[in-house]
Amino acid sequence: MRKRLLTKKYLRDVKEYMIKITKDNDAYVCVKEIIDTEKPFSISTGLCLVNNGYHIVEILPMNEKFCVRTFLNEKNEILQKYIDVSLGNGIDEETNIPYYDDIFLDIIINDDEIYVDDKDELEKAYKNNEITEETYNEANIICNQILSELNTNKYIIKDVREYL
């Protein structure tokens, strides 16, 4: 399990960016506008997710156990939705920045393709006694719940372009 601050994700090769965190009812929204990057970030399929003029919008619902990250290109077209399964979300006491407790499992939505990623990481953490059986089971239950709510959960189906 890893504590993830919203301000830290997907900015490794980014030289200049603007970031805005706002509260929208019972969720925090983090908008990252990529101004200048040393090199574009692409996934193994070749899909570029981080480049100059792109946006990353993260919605962190405080009453749910996930974080939804949406990648948009320079035309504000949605490239991918990436859902991190978490054991809980909150506000970091030291930095006052929203965070989620990442529990390895991710759900990735590209066009009409949906798949669960990093099951192997969850299995490895369980086998190496890095997480308990209870945590392992909870992560799988949360993941299955998210999968069943993909078309109805207000945070997942939200058109994030309204935050840009």
What would you call each of these model-derived segments?
Residues M1-H55:
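Charge-rich, low-complexity N-terminal segments
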Residues L11-I19, E64-V68, D102-F104:
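Short small/polar-residue motifs
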Residues D26, E64, D112-E113:
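Beta-strand-connecting loop/turn residues
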Residues P40-T95:
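The feature represents the first ordered module of a protein
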Residues K75-N129:
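Conserved, surface-exposed functional patches that form binding/active-site neighborhoods
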Residues E121-I146:
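Short, surface-exposed, low-complexity cationic segments
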Residues E138-L164:
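Charged phosphate-binding loop/patch that engages nucleotide di/tri-phosphates or the phosphate backbone
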